Amino acid sequence: CVQSCSFGPLTWSCDGNTK
């Protein structure tokens, strides 16, 4: 999979994982 990280105001998702 491609490692893509998206940072949001509340939650962030990286490589299809959300924390």
UniProtKB/Swiss-Prot annotation:
InterPro entries: Dur/DurB-like (IPR046016)
Assigned keywords, A-Z: Antibiotic, Antimicrobial, Bacteriocin, Lantibiotic, Thioether bond
Pfam family, one: DurB-like
Functional note: Acts as an inhibitor of angiotensin I converting enzyme.
Family according to the record: Belongs to the type B lantibiotic family.
Identification of the protein by name: Lantibiotic ancovenin
Residue location of crosslink Beta-methyllanthionine (Cys-Thr): 1-18, 5-11
Post-translational modification: Maturation of lantibiotics involves the enzymatic conversion of Thr, and Ser into dehydrated AA and the formation of thioether bonds with cysteine or the formation of dialkylamine bonds with lysine. This is followed by membrane translocation and cleavage of the modified precursor.
Highest taxon above the source species: Bacteria
UniProt keyword Signal, yes or no: no
Species of the source: Streptomyces sp. (strain A647P-2)
Phylogenetic placement of the source organism: Bacteria, Bacillati, Actinomycetota, Actinomycetes, Kitasatosporales
UniProt record, GO biological process: defense response to bacterium; killing of cells of another organism
